[in-house]
Amino acid sequence: MALASLAAMPMSVGATEKPNVIIIIADDLGWGDVSAYGNRTVSTPNIDFLAQNGACFTNGHASSATSTPSRYGLMTGMYPWRNDDAKILPGDAPLLVDTDQFTIGKMFQHAGYSTAAIGKWHLGMGEGKIDWNRQITPAGNAIGFDYTYLIAATVDRVPTVYVENGRVANLDPNDPISVDYEHPFEGEPTGVNNPELVKMHWSHGHQNAVINGIPRIGFMKGGKSAIWNEKT
């Protein structure tokens, strides 16, 4: 499951009339999958606590059934089918949301909130042909978020790193990141050629770079200090 959260906090300590707002987006999670909405097989106490102390909707609809389009709809308030590019994006796609567009982040900023986006993004970054070793712009900070800590692409795509306010977190400049979605890097393991390194068997499309024992989409080398650890 890939999670992302959008958070908005009042800028002023004295602004007690404004509640904190947290929006959690989860891939492949049905409304009936949490116990707050009736699931009796799986217990989700933390989500239930939020539901009990927040607002529950009983008639909600997603603008799309897939990742990028639904996130685009939530971010902009626009139907994703109105934008031909609002489809599942590759890991090195440029920022899908125009920096001039009004977004949910900008809405909260205009209302006096500090804003943050954390986790899976999947709305693209930069202007294409991303250099992961430099400042990446435009990204989330350009469309309404004061702070961002984002998965660079998706959990199954390279590079498997976090991007904090436009820069890869914990990156050693002496070990730069290289990413290619077409050609493997010599000497770097892949799911096809190195099955002994794979903890989870690959499926078609997910058979490229092996990172943390998991075969990914695309090829990557370098950036060892910045690679996330699924266990932590």
Where are these regions (language model features)?
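Formylglycine-dependent sulfatase
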Residues: 1-6, 11-232
